[in-house]
Amino acid sequence: MSSSEVASHYNKVLQVGIEGRKESRIFFMRNMNNWVKSQLINDAKQRVNDNGVNNPRVLDLACGKGGDLKKWDIAGAKDVVMADVADVSIQQAEERYKQMFGYKKNNIFTVQFIVADCTKENLEDRIENKDPFDLVSCQFALHYSFVDEASARIFLKNAVGMLKPGGVFIGTLPDADRIVWSMRNGENGQFANEVCKITYENVEELAEGKVPLFGAKFHFSLDEQVNCPEFLAYFPLVKHLLEELDMELLFVHNFAEAINKWLEPGRRLLESMTGLETYPNEKLSGKSDDEYLEAKAKLDAFPEDERIKTMGTLSKSEWEAICMYLVFGFRKKKSEAEKTEEEPATTKPVAESESEQKEVTESEEKEDQEDCEHQEAQTN
């Protein structure tokens, strides 16, 4: 699948109103995905602060419709470059920024919007300000470049080529190992539940264990959204290619691990973003009681005198779909001379205030849900 076909797919995705999104079968899953992304950006923000930078220069690669613009504002960004292959998505991102600018006047970061195929073009040639980036983010999009080795290498070079030593590269992408395991254990090379269906194009290739490192095409349909072919990106391979570009791994977690890691510090924001469904209630999103067996068991396990009436949860199908993704963080290596010259940095507290939480929550409701990147368009 060519980059022009990917662009055409995302350009055709229709925007859905807030009320319409609330009726979606994956409403809570989308909110949870956005919460995970918020926590990931918050983690990166702290690491950048620890590197002595309080107002980072940011590259938002495969930015889609600009769903993270408010997040960059809250992160204190001074300058952001937003690049995407889909021209309609970039137009919508520009409109979002104009709305933010009108509200905040001059108290906002500057932005350059670029329509570019980052699997073929040298993005640096298109960027006006040649200063290096402190932070690069690529959400639910990196794996599209793994159509072939050349495309993947160019995309990753664009991602980290202008990243300063000590700078951070974060992202989310489908967990190739988990997806392959799920398809192999399904019927006819596919996995399906109430909210998603994943199929591998070459069933014989899958059955024989001959899935290639590049060009391994699969289809991920989510909540009856338009299906755009994608490519598996094995994380050990992603890590290897980035290490060739002087990057070092900071962390990698599947979404289940990430949620457990960030749950306590981010609980209030998760509640504000409606990332969990209240169980039991009269209008559960799942179609059967089987979707909530674990939640029911946990409630029933409480002693009679301590029993609570409700709890927050996700349906079984939403949880299975969420577990198909992972988050990662890399850092650009510093030279020995740079390490020697370093002095302790004065860091800025990273915890979000209540007002910041309210702002990002309102942003997620009004805008980011249109932009859960791969999840949203099929989620930015």
Swiss-Prot record:
Gene coding for it: tag-72
Protein's UniProt name: mRNA cap guanine-N(7) methyltransferase
Residue ranges, annotated region (Disordered): 336-380
Protein purpose: mRNA-capping methyltransferase that methylates the N7 position of the added guanosine to the 5'-cap structure of mRNAs. Binds RNA containing 5'-terminal GpppC.
Class in the EC hierarchy, top level: transferase
GO molecular function (one): RNA binding
Residues annotated for mRNA binding in this entry: 33-34
Keywords: Methyltransferase, mRNA capping, mRNA processing, Nucleus, RNA-binding, S-adenosyl-L-methionine, Transferase
Main location: nucleus
Key word S-adenosyl-L-methionine present: yes
Organism: Caenorhabditis elegans
mRNA cap 0 methyltransferase domain boundaries: 24-333
